[in-house]
Amino acid sequence: MANHSSAKKAARQTVKRTLINKKRSSAIKTFIKKVAHEISLGNKENANLALSVAQSKIMQGVKKNIIKLNTASRKISRLSKQIKSLNESK
């Protein structure tokens, strides 16, 4: 356990930041799942709307260092590709 007051404060801050980061990470995953759900249902319009919201949340995660830029780009690219194939197939 931390003995110095600065170390105790750092430990408190770490706990607080960890909770915030987990919340943000969970929110990003939830928005990605919403897009995947709309794609599985075949709703083009809803999938596009969900993608725009998810893309915004993913990029906010990049800005807050929750996920890396390349990871975010890969996720957005794969979701966009699925929606594009959905649009072409129907």
UniProtKB/Swiss-Prot annotation:
Keyword line: Ribonucleoprotein, Ribosomal protein, RNA-binding, rRNA-binding
Matching HAMAP family: Ribosomal_bS20
InterPro entries attached to this UniProt entry: Ribosomal_bS20 (IPR002583), Ribosomal_bS20_sf (IPR036510)
Organism in which the protein naturally occurs: Rickettsia felis (strain ATCC VR-1525 / URRWXCal2)
Family from the record: Belongs to the bacterial ribosomal protein bS20 family.
Task of the protein: Binds directly to 16S ribosomal RNA.
CC per GO annotation: small ribosomal subunit
GO MF annotation: an example: small ribosomal subunit rRNA binding
Family annotation (Pfam families): Ribosomal_S20p
Keyword Disulfide bond: no
Protein name from the UniProt record: Small ribosomal subunit protein bS20
GO annotation, biological process: translation
